[in-house]
C-alpha cells in the first residue's frame, strides 16, 4: 500500500499534515503522539520580530467550531531557528514553516533566512484574518499574492506554499495568482472572518472585533473552495478547514487535494492526525486501493 504523495517537489510519507497555528512548533504534541508518523508538521506563523499577539480573550467557542484572535503570537524567526528547529531536526518528518510579513520585503527576508537545513518548505501566510496589520491586505489582492510569491521564490530553494484566505470573491483567481508567481503549491482555507457579541455588555467578545472562525462549521465552504482551486491550477492543492475524521480528509482528496491539514481538531483530540492516517489506511484496504494517488481528484461529476 502506498500512502506517499508529492507536494511541490516535497515527498511526504502520507498526505496528513498539521495546520499552522494549531500544533505549536511540534514539541507541544510530541508527548502525545509519534511525530514521525505525520506527513508534515507546519509550525505556527512566524514574524521577523517577536510578537505578543492580541489581548485576551483570544478564543471563543461557537456551535461546531471556534473563533480565535491570537494575533500571531510567536518568538520571532531568530528564536525559532535557534531554539525550536533543532528539536524538529531529530524527527523523520517534513517541516514546513509558516511566515507572516507586513511587507513583501519581510516575506523575502524570512524566506531567505529559512533556506537552511531542517526546513523542507515555506508556507506564505497571506490570509490570517485576525491581525490588523500584515497578511489580510495581501491575501485579498491577487496582484499582491503574485508579487509576494515571486519575491520569495527568488531567495529560496525550498518548496513554497501559498496559504490562501477564504475571504475573497473568487478563490480560483487567487490560486492562479500564486501559481503564476511561481508557487509550488497552495493551501486553503484559512479561517473565515467572523465575530461574537456579549449581549449583556453589548460589546464585541474580541478586542479586535473580527476574529477567525474554524472547525467543522467551515468544512462545506472549505471543501467547495478546494474543489474550485484544484480546477483552477495545475500545482498541488493542500486542503484544510474543519477536518476531524478520515472521512473528512477523503472528501478533500476526492475533491482534488493532494494532501490535507488538520487544525482545530488538534485542540479537541491531540491524536486526531494519527486517527485520520489510520482511517485512510483502513479505507484503502476495504476498497482495494493500492495507491493513495488513485483517490486524489477522483470526484465523479455528471
UniProtKB/Swiss-Prot annotation:
InterPro entries listed in its UniProt record: Aldolase_TIM (IPR013785), DHO_dehydrogenase (IPR050074), DHOD_1B (IPR033888), Dihydroorotate_DH_1 (IPR024920), Dihydroorotate_DH_1_2 (IPR012135), Dihydroorotate_DH_cat (IPR005720), Dihydroorotate_DH_CS (IPR001295), Dihydroorotate_DH_I (IPR049622)
Family of this protein: Belongs to the dihydroorotate dehydrogenase family. Type 1 subfamily.
Subcellular localization: Cytoplasm
Biochemical pathway: Pyrimidine metabolism; UMP biosynthesis via de novo pathway; orotate from (S)-dihydroorotate (NAD(+) route): step 1/1
Protein name per UniProt: Dihydroorotate dehydrogenase B (NAD(+)), catalytic subunit
PROSITE patterns membership: DHODEHASE_1, DHODEHASE_2
Enzyme Commission no: 1.3.1.14
Cofactor(s) demanded: FMN
Record-annotated active site: 128
Highest taxon above the source species: Bacteria
Keywords from the named record: Cytoplasm, Flavoprotein, FMN, NAD, Oxidoreductase, Pyrimidine biosynthesis
Entry's Gene Ontology cellular component terms: cytoplasm
Catalytic activity field: (S)-dihydroorotate + NAD(+) = orotate + NADH + H(+)
Binding annotation for substrate: 44, 68-72, 125, 190-191
Gene Ontology biological process terms in this record: 'de novo' pyrimidine nucleobase biosynthetic process; 'de novo' UMP biosynthetic process
Residues given in the record as FMN binding sites: 20, 44-45, 98, 125, 163, 189, 215, 241-242, 263-264
Function: Catalyzes the conversion of dihydroorotate to orotate with NAD(+) as electron acceptor.
UniProt subunit comment: Heterotetramer of 2 PyrK and 2 PyrD type B subunits.
Amino acid at each position: 500500500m502506498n500512502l506517499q504523495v508529492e507536494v511541490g517537489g516535497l515527498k511526504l510519507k502520507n498526505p496528513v499534515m498539521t495546520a499552522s497555528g494549531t500544533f505549536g512548533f511540534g514539541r507541544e504534541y510530541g508527548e502525545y503522539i509519534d511525530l514521525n508518523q505525520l506527513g508534515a508538521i507546519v509550525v505556527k506563523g512566524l514574524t521577523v520580530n517577536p510578537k505578543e499577539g492580541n489581548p485576551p480573550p483570544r478564543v471563543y467557542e461557537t456551535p461546531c467550531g471556534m473563533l480565535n484572535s491570537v494575533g500571531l503570537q510567536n518568538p520571532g524567526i531568530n528564536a525559532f531557528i535557534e531554539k525550536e528547529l533543532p528539536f524538529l531536526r531529530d524527527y523523520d518528518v517534513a517541516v514546513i514553516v509558516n511566515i507572516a510579513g507586513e511587507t513583501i520585503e519581510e516575506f523575502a527576508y524570512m524566506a531567505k533566512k529559512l533556506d537552511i537545513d531542517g526546513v523542507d518548505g515555506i508556507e506564505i501566510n497571506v490570509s490570517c484574518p485576525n491581525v490588523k496589520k500584515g497578511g489580510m491586505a495581501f491575501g485579498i489582492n491577487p496582484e499582491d499574492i503574485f508579487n509576494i510569491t515571486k519575491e520569495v521564490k527568488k531567495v529560496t530553494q525550498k518548496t513554497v506554499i501559498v496559504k490562501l484566505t477564504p475571504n475573497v470573491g473568487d478563490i480560483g483567481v487567487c490560486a492562479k495568482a500564486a501559481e503564476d508567481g511561481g508557487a509550488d503549491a497552495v493551501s486553503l482555507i484559512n479561517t473565515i472572518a467572523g465575530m461574537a457579541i456579549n449581549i449583556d455588555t453589548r460589546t464585541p467578545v474580541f478586542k479586535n472585533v473580527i476574529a477567525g472562525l474554524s472547525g467543522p462549521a467551515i468544512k462545506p465552504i472549505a471543501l467547495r473552495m478546494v474543489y474550485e482551486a484544484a480546477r483552477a491550477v495545475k500545482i498541488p492543492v493542500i486542503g484544510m478547514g474543519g477536518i476531524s475524521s478520515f472521512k473528512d480528509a477523503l472528501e478533500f482528496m476526492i475533491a482534488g487535494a493532494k494532501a490535507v491539514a488538520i487544525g482545530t481538531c488538534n485542540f479537541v483530540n491531540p491524536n486526531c492526525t494519527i486517527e485520520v492516517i489510520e482511517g485512510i489506511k483502513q479505507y484503502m484496504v476495504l476498497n482495494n486501493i493500492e495507491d493513495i494517488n488513485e483517490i486524489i481528484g477522483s470526484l465523479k461529476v455528471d
